[in-house]
Amino acid sequence: MAASMRMYRAVGALGLASILNPARMAAPVLVMPTRTKKRYFIPPAVGAKHKTMADMISKARAAGVVTPHETMERPINIACTAGIFDPYIPPEGDARLSSLSKEGLKQRTQQLKQTAASQLAIRKVKEYDSEFTTKTFPEKAQELFIAAHQCLTKFDRHELHTLVTERCYPEMVRGNRYRTIQWSFVESIEAPRVVQVRCPEMVSKGNLYAQVTVRMHNKQSLTIYDRFGRVMCGSEEPRDVLEYVVFERHMVNPYGTWRMHGKIVPSWAPPKEPIVKTVLLPGPAVDPLQELEDISLEKTEPVLQQWYK
């Protein structure tokens, strides 16, 4: 009995020593590397048969290659339209022909149709904007026109977005990154006036967009310099400019405002002045021991080229 008690105490002491020994607490771990089959995604051959797009996608997923989901939808913007509804066709020379002639009678009939359509559109606009009138709107449109061009000369894109639509913005700023624009409004030769109003429905019934065409005849000065400071287009002398500017507003939007949407260029308008392109003319090879004054250089005038769309 005493021997068994001593044996039990010895075993208990060894067990306690094994528990308190940190070296014996960590049991040996045997790590055996096992090699598994590694699958690679191999694209099918060019002339392989019975290989559909679904089969290739399933094999790619089995190999662990996840193809991103590509949507074929194009984002659209409903804050403005993508064009001009029924663009106003100004008479040639902006003059009225005699009603006794055939062309004058046709012009008069066309004007009556446009006036009737404009009156119906004005009624729709006044349902959403009670302060809209054809007498006060031209002055507001001219102020908006001047402010938009002043922001263009200062390259204030944040303010310009509030004055022009998303369709007009890229047309105004395209190609002007390395150019310097100087524009100024001198005076109005004739008071601006509304020549056409359109308010059609788009996408769904009741979604109205209003477009007002304003005739502006004024004096402006425009000069465009390239990045080297050379004059590309225009001059500092004021010129008479006759423009038909279109302003648009999303009538359903309670926070919508009138913004400049585009310009109508008549077919009889004179062509624009070509922009002088700055090019590098290769000169003659100069000997290091030769003076520049000894070389006769031929001066050539730059050729005017059409450099706009």
Swiss-Prot record:
Task: Name where it mostly resides.
Answer: mitochondrion
**Do you know which Pfam families this protein is assigned to?**
Tim44
Q: Which UniProt keywords apply?
A: Mitochondrion, Ribonucleoprotein, Ribosomal protein, Transit peptide
User: Quick one: a GO biological-process term for this protein?
Assistant: mitochondrial translation
- Molecular function per GO: structural constituent of ribosome
Has UniProt tagged this entry with the keyword Ribosomal protein?
yes
Which InterPro entries is this protein grouped with?
A: mtLSU_mL45, NTF2-like_dom_sf, Tim44-like_dom
Compartment list: Mitochondrion
Q: Name one GO cellular component term.
A: mitochondrial large ribosomal subunit
SMART domains referenced in this protein's UniProt entry, alphabetically: Tim44
What quaternary arrangement does the UniProt entry report? Answer: Component of the mitochondrial ribosome large subunit (39S) which comprises a 16S rRNA and about 50 distinct proteins.
Briefly state the protein's biological role.
Answer: Component of the mitochondrial large ribosomal subunit (mt-LSU). Within the mitochondrial ribosomes, required to direct the nascent polypeptide toward the tunnel exit and position the exit at a distance from the membrane surface.
Which family is annotated? Belongs to the mitochondrion-specific ribosomal protein mL45 family.
Question: What's the protein here called?
Answer: Large ribosomal subunit protein mL45
Which gene is transcribed and translated to give this protein? mrpl45
